Design a protein with these regions (language model features):
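Auxiliary Fe-S-binding modules of radical SAM enzymes
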Residues: 1-93, 242-251, 258-349
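Short linear Ser/Thr-Pro motifs
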Residues: 76, 109-110, 191, 213
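Canonical Radical SAM [4Fe-4S] cluster-binding loop centered on the CxxxCxxC motif
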Residues: 99-136
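Ferredoxin-type iron-sulfur electron-transfer modules in oxidoreductases and energy-metabolism complexes
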Residues: 135, 139-147
């Protein structure tokens, strides 16, 4: 049986330099390799033609580019495309391409499943299986047909990014470094429930935008919706955020899914205004996509508008996020769950 080769994709410049040293290649070869990977986006080592044949052959003995295409895709009438990738362990992860007027956004996953077990999230119902490597995260960007159209990236797919922060930060380095994609950090948003250790490290080591999953300003209710509240409360998150400047390049936003009869009254809007006082931020109101066996419902647009208007009138900038891909398993984790269960002979109800 042939020994699996190690992927070069997802390696930082420092890691490529170590590989080059180990193989006795000249030091400058590291930047040549990263250029082939992240600028020219080749699929094979043979395409790295400014490396000598000898060095290409040496590299090929233990390494490969490591790009792998999606195994399935679903296309919405609104142009949204949900891609399904298979991991080497035969699990499935999702990435979603969202064209939006003059922007093209890709939503990527950071884990197989998730430990957070948020009541409203299909991925949480899967439980946690594995962290994705930087290679597996970056492959979601590298291997879709629309990769050259992308203007923005959001870590809002499967998993909790701060629970896999080593690999996420590695991807952010590759995306924003001169040797990598050369993107501005302003093109990237990382969403989190707000894990304390990860939150502070992310804010100190990255300049990318931050989105915090709030969903209710009431700690006792948030514990019911999001068990992570028990470990690190929304008020503690806010206390940390007060120590950082969000008035310039970096943007801070709070995600708020509006549930019928749960968190949709203006009483909650009033509490949000109090909670966020003194922080430069925005609130993104989100429609709920129903998932099986969860007794939560979304609200009508009139309720969303009233909630948004109250926040805006009281000094908190708020938007209503347009729903996309409703005809293709819109809720995060739905497609991967359906695929996993299909392979096991189970039907998603």
């Amino acid at each position: 049986m042939e020994t699996p080769k190690t992927a070069l994709l997802g390696r930082t410049l420092d890691e490529i330099q170590q590989i080059v040293r180990n193989l006795g290649m000249p030091k400058f070869a590291a930047k040549q390799i990263t250029s082939w990977l992240y600028d020219k986006k080749v699929e094979t080592i043979d395409e790295m033609t400014n490396l000598s044949l000898k060095h290409r052959e040496a590299l090929k003995e233990g390494y490969e580019v490591g790009a792998s295409a999606p195994v399935e895709e679903m296309r919405s009438v609104d142009g949204t495309v949900k891609y399904l990738f298979r991991t080497p362990a035969h699990n499935f992860i999702e990435a979603v391409y969202i064209p939006d007027e003059d922007r093209a956004i890709l939503c990527v996953s950071s884990q197989v499943g998730c430990k957070m077990n948020c009541k409203f999230c299909m991925t949480g119902k899967q439980g946690f299986t594995a962290n994705l490597s930087a290679h597996q995260i970056l492959n979601q960007i590298y291997s879709i047909p629309e990769r050259e159209k992308l203007t923005n990236l959001v870590f809002m797919g499967m998993g909790e990014p701060f629970d896999n922060l080593d690999e996420v930060l590695k991807v952010l380095e590759i995306l924003t470094s001169e040797y990598g994609y050369g993107w501005s950090p302003k093109r990237i948003t990382v969403s989190s429930v707000g894990l304390k250790k990860g939150l502070e490290r992310f804010l100190n080591e990255s300049d990318c935008h931050l989105a915090i999953s709030m969903h209710t300003p009431i700690p006792s209710q948030r514990r019911d919706l999001m068990p992570a509240e028990k470990a690190f409360s929304i008020t503690e998150i806010i206390d940390i955020l007060h120590n950082y400047d969000f008035s310039k390049q970096r943007r801070l936003s709070f995600e708020y899914i509006v549930f019928k009869g749960v968190n949709d009254s203006l009483i909650y809007a009033k509490e949000i205004v109090k909670l966020l006082r003194g922080i430069e931020c925005r609130v993104n109101l989100i429609r709920f996509h129903a998932i099986p066996n969860v007794d939560l419902e979304g609200v009508d647009m009139e309720t969303m508008v009233a909630f948004r208007d109250y926040l805006t009138q009281h000094g908190v900038f708020a938007t209503i996020r347009a729903s996309r891909g409703e005809d293709i398993f819109a809720a995060c984790g739905m497609l991967s769950t359906a695929k996993q269960q299909k392979e096991k002979g189970v039907t998603l109800q």
